């Protein structure tokens, strides 16, 4: 049996997030597993002239996405090299871990639906083998 991979949120997952009615900021925890080589076969208009690694394609995506994140009041808090869990499944590892802060869920959705942002998401798709995205609601303590 093949392991299921995840690269984009489902409609139901987005609906669930919207219905939570989170007030204030969220921080999105992103776990990314990269392809060895980027696959631009579905995105020939933005493909580089030579083959590049999944890492290089993903870093291009981050550089191009950063202004869109910031336009909606968001901030890239961390882009870090992943690896194996200290606590968690021993056979599971992630290449890149990110924390992205957004002012609100609606600002996050506005960022994701920006037509100009959508033009660069091919770099993300070309680079990612699997991913997880967990929106975190800020708690007071």
What are the residue ranges of the model-derived segments?
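Short S/T/G/P-rich N-terminal loop/turn motif that feeds into the first structured element of a domain
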Residues: 1-96, 103, 107, 137-141
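Short, Lys/Arg-rich amphipathic alpha-helical interaction segments
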Residues: 88, 99-101, 105-141
